């Protein structure tokens, strides 16, 4: 049997194939193809995933000299691949004997691979569109994107027709013959372990296969990923400081995440955690009672209301901190939010502590009527005493979104007003303005960058240096870290 070697890139996520062999595999003729030296493909930077019991994931080839030749490439029985750890393997298909083998002893092939890898890479770099390539397909542009799509399609067609790796092997058949393949099982750690006696069988019972929990395995990991609001890309939920790795968009942070970002570990002491709303005006809408919405938000966020307040150390400097949480009913300001912030400011006044309020709110909470509006005046009053009478230092940090009554009260009363990049800051939202005034709101006019140019903000600071910037501002206003004797 003639063998041809070439290099593929594999990574999780592009094409999904459920391992299994066609019941009628004996009828498939064996294909033989040779590959000319000037049409080899190499580039193994990506991960390689072995065939598992249920599914395997293969990525497309990165680049070809001629897209048309992929049908010849994938028709061969042996594939030469390399994983992200630079380990080389050969994947061997024997259609006639129904074998599937992976060999990781390729020392004799290394020189062969590297010699042609260098030649082909040079050829790819020097080749221009004006060359008369006899293998050029006029319907496929010589771009990485189109080439990948074409190769994906070819690989998909080959495996579907020759190994029947889709719904074909799930269907019932009168043929009771069971197909077996020997497999190398890839462990979770990514290391390949040999299992000579391990077999994968095509099952004729569709219900047994479809009832497997493996088909719903992704449901168990929904909480691990988050989607960017701007580019819609998926990323690990614990991405550093909730900043999109692709486009740099700032994602929303919970109040607990912001406290962890700002306060030194082990120094946070929360205040008034047991304060909850009692539906003071017995608000009830046709959709859902206010009390039910409060209960639902508490279960979802683990908070009692839309703000966390407390005392902690920021780079060793004792600080009074209040952080609003947009996930709790849009960060709306009700009587509990107003009372907790008021008590925090009063405590900071008595203890002569610097104050930070991190704003993220849709405004006053309509379910509490005039009681929520009253919080604006109450907070502004205690802030006046804190700033004017005691001459203490208050930093307001505006995040996206900060709107309504929060913007009209303590959000814009800081001695220093800092905003995050691209933060949406306004009193009335764009839709409300356009429907009320019947005028279009210019794009970006309510963004932090626009407000900075108009003098409404003092600075726009990214999340990474924010803690250091605030610490320096505190020291400029004579708030210094505690010495070792004062730290308990």
Curated annotation (Swiss-Prot):
Pfam families: Carboxyl_trans (PF01039). GO terms for biological process: fatty acid biosynthetic process; malonyl-CoA biosynthetic process. GO terms for cellular component: acetyl-CoA carboxylase complex; chloroplast stroma. InterPro entries: AcCoA_carboxyl_beta, Acetyl_CoA_COase_Trfase_b_su, ClpP/crotonase-like_dom_sf, COA_CT_N. The keyword Transferase applies. One of its GO terms (molecular function) is zinc ion binding. It is found in: Plastid, Chloroplast stroma. Its EC number is 2.1.3.15. A zinc finger (C4-type) spans 228-247. Keywords: ATP-binding, Chloroplast, Fatty acid biosynthesis, Fatty acid metabolism, Lipid biosynthesis, Lipid metabolism, Metal-binding, Nucleotide-binding, Plastid, Transferase, Zinc, Zinc-finger. Its cofactor is Zn(2+). PROSITE patterns: COA_CT_NTER. Pathway: Lipid metabolism; malonyl-CoA biosynthesis; malonyl-CoA from acetyl-CoA: step 1/1. Residues 224-488 form the CoA carboxyltransferase N-terminal domain. Binds 1 zinc ion per subunit. Acetyl-CoA carboxylase is a heterohexamer composed of biotin carboxyl carrier protein, biotin carboxylase and 2 subunits each of ACCase subunit alpha and ACCase plastid-coded subunit beta (accD). Component of the acetyl coenzyme A carboxylase (ACC) complex. Biotin carboxylase (BC) catalyzes the carboxylation of biotin on its carrier protein (BCCP) and then the CO(2) group is transferred by the transcarboxylase to acetyl-CoA to form malonyl-CoA. Belongs to the AccD/PCCB family. This is Acetyl-coenzyme A carboxylase carboxyl transferase subunit beta, chloroplastic. It comes from Arabis hirsuta. The lineage of its organism: Eukaryota, Viridiplantae, Streptophyta, Embryophyta, Tracheophyta.
């Amino acid at each position: 049997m003639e063998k041809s070697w070439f290099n593929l890139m594999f990574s999780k996520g592009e094409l999904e194939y459920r391992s299994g062999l066609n019941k009628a595999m004996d009828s498939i003729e064996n294909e033989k193809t040779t590959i000319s030296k000037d049409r080899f493909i190499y580039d193994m930077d990506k991960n390689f995933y072995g065939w598992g019991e249920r599914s395997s994931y293969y990525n497309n080839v990165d680049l070809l000299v001629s897209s048309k030749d992929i049908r010849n490439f994938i028709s061969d029985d042996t594939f030469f691949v390399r994983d992200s750890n630079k380990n080389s393997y050969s994947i061997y298909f024997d259609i006639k004997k129904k074998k599937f083998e992976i060999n990781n002893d390729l020392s004799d092939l290394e020189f062969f691979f590297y010699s042609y890898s260098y030649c082909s890479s040079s050829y790819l770099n020097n080749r221009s569109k004006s060359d008369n390539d006899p293998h050029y397909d006029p319907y496929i542009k010589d771009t990485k994107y189109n080439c990948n799509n074409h190769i994906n399609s070819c690989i998909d067609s080959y495996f579907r027709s020759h190994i029947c790796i889709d719904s074909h092997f799930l269907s019932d058949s009168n043929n009771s013959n069971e197909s077996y393949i020997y497999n190398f099982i890839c462990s979770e750690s990514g290391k390949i372990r040999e299992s000579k006696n391990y077999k994968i069988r095509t099952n004729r019972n569709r219900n047994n296969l479809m009832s497997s929990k493996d088909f719903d395995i992704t449901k168990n990991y929904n909480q691990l990923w988050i989607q960017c609001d701007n580019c819609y890309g998926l990323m690990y939920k614990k991405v550093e400081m909730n900043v999109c790795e692709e486009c740099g968009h700032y994602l929303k942070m919970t109040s607990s995440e912001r406290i962890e970002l700002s306060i030194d570990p082990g120094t946070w002491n929360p205040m008034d955690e047991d304060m909850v709303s009692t539906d003071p005006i017995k608000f009830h809408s046709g959709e859902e009672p206010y009390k039910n919405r409060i209960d639902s938000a508490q279960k979802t966020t683990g908070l009692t209301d839309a703000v966390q307040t407390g005392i902690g150390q920021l780079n060793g400097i004792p600080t009074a901190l209040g952080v609003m949480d947009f996930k709790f009913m849009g960060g709306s300001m009700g009587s509990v939010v107003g009372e907790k912030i008021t008590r925090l400011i009063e405590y900071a006044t008595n203890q002569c502590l610097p104050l930070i309020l991190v704003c993220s709110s849709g405004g006053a909470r309509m379910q509490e009527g005039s009681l929520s509006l009253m919080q604006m005046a109450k907070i502004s009053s205690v802030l006046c005493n804190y700033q004017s009478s005691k001459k203490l230092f208050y930093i307001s940090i505006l995040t996206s979104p900060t709107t309504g009554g929060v913007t009209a009260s303590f959000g814009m009363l800081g001695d220093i007003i800092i905003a995050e990049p691209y933060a949406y800051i306004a009193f009335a939202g764009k839709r409300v303005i356009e429907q009320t005034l019947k005028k279009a709101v210019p794009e970006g006019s309510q963004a932090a960058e626009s407000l900075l140019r108009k003098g409404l903000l003092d600075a726009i600071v990214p999340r990474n240096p924010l803690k250091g910037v605030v610490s320096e501002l505190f020291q400029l206003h004579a708030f210094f870290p505690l010495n070792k004797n004062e730290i308990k």
